[in-house]
């Protein structure tokens, strides 16, 4: 079986370094908000081209805290793509604000800048962009719209660690950005983790306080904060894996390039790439009309596939108020997408087997 993602194989490459780091943290006697977190925050901010990084417990918290730090809440609206993972939308709802869904570009799957402006009202406070599957959104167009209406731009970078747009890495393209370090991400922890990057000193200071019960000094609380802190063990592991991220992303690009060149099947719609050197290919997503049959066929060929994502947000029971709304592009995407295996530890033989199997489908 060719697995969709072999996390054991990915992480065993760093076994010695990780065990040394874990021993170092264990022996330090300090496990929350210590030197390892400080070190990772410095490294990751520098990597992203941002001035500040604030480590938090997970990617959802990262987005939720950004919105909270901007005092966006009840009565406010936030523009967000209609085909994102639900966490992007939950972060808005958690603050009492209203998510306003905007359809994606059918080719890139990212939010369509041409459809944003018509959804802006006097209540709109921010645009949340999601760099879906590893490819940056059209940030030049989006930032121009945000500037015109005096809106904040929040990046959801959960699937795009290291992706580049016009020479700059995601995480430095808007006002603030949220990252997830869920184990399956391009930069994944051995558990949950997240981070926020920004160039705004005042925002960074407030986020540092909000993530720690709203406390700027022990037992003194400026805000009604939360407990959302990246722990020392995960920070130490992430520092190790960050040093290999560019190499891993390059291997993903090589596999994606092979897929794009060699998959030739009229039943398979391949992804559209705006810049092949900037995409980090968190996922390689194709579209197939008869998705269930395609997945069943590949499973019989011992190839694991996944769906990202089967149900669009407006069809989720949690958001029943949207059930009657129509988002035809999102609905088409969610009914057809299939993610093929892609990871930095896939062998050439495995990649070739995937291509051969996909090319035989339907014949």
From Swiss-Prot:
Its cofactor is pyridoxal 5'-phosphate. The modification N6-(pyridoxal phosphate)lysine is found at residue 185. It is an enzyme of class 2 (transferase). Keywords: Pyridoxal phosphate, Transferase. Its EC number is 2.6.1.90. It catalyses: dTDP-3-amino-3,6-dideoxy-alpha-D-galactopyranose + 2-oxoglutarate = dTDP-3-dehydro-6-deoxy-alpha-D-galactose + L-glutamate. Signal peptide: none annotated. GO terms for molecular function: pyridoxal phosphate binding; transaminase activity. InterPro entries: DegT/StrS_aminotransferase, PyrdxlP-dep_Trfase, PyrdxlP-dep_Trfase_major, PyrdxlP-dep_Trfase_small. Gene3D superfamilies: Aspartate Aminotransferase, domain 1, Type I PLP-dependent aspartate aminotransferase-like (Major domain). The keyword Transferase applies. GO terms for biological process: polysaccharide biosynthetic process. PANTHER family: 3-OXO-GLUCOSE-6-PHOSPHATE:GLUTAMATE AMINOTRANSFERASE, TRANSAMINASE. Specifically aminates dTDP-6-deoxy-D-xylohex-3-ulose to form dTDP-D-Fucp3N in the biosynthesis of dTDP-3-acetamido-3,6-dideoxy-alpha-D-galactose, a glycan chain of the S-layer. Belongs to the DegT/DnrJ/EryC1 family. This is dTDP-3-amino-3,6-dideoxy-alpha-D-galactopyranose transaminase. It comes from Aneurinibacillus thermoaerophilus. The gene is fdtB.
